[in-house]
A protein has these predicted regions:
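Acidic, Ser/Thr- and Gly-enriched intrinsically disordered low-complexity segments
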Residues: 1-145
Length: 145
């Protein structure tokens, strides 16, 4: 049949239809680059990285083998100066789905002067991927989401 259709310059219409199944959860990625220049910045960057790694993971329930408390939720708001930026869509409550950190984004790890904890990197990239915890609908978009 394929050779005949090719000879005739035709293709069979498979009469396919698309059926609505569901709405996916929205995801948002935010890339960051850190280049600490001194001790204070190095400590601040380290705390920021640890903070996101900590809050993306669940907590094991005490005395409940195999059970976790859910990870932290985030409320992200796009700001312009001191106000919410209404030109960008609002983001509902999210969880941090992925936190990827690269301590050598240029292919090699370079460090500041070592201290008692080790040698802090001079350039770090971090990409955060957040996933909303609710499905968007026409009603939520009408509210600015």
């Amino acid at each position: 049949r394929g050779v005949y259709d090719k000879f005739k310059g035709q293709a069979k219409n498979p009469n396919l239809e698309s059926i609505f199944k569901s709405v996916p959860f929205r995801e948002f990625s935010f890339p960051f680059t850190f280049a600490p220049k001194n001790e204070k910045e190095k400590d601040s960057v380290h705390k920021i990285l640890q903070l996101f790694r900590f809050h993306m993971l669940p907590e094991q329930q005490s005395g409940a083998n195999g059970y976790f408390n859910v990870p932290s939720e985030f409320q992200i708001t796009y700001m312009y100066r001191d106000n919410e930026n209404s030109y960008l869509p609002r983001i509902s409550r999210c969880v941090l789905k992925q936190c990827s950190i690269d301590y050598g984004p240029e292919g090699v790890v370079s460090t500041l002067t070592p201290d008692e904890k080790g040698a802090p990197p001079t350039l770090i990239t971090m990409n955060l991927t957040f996933g909303e915890t609710e499905i968007m609908t026409k009603e939520t978009v009408a509210k600015g989401y």
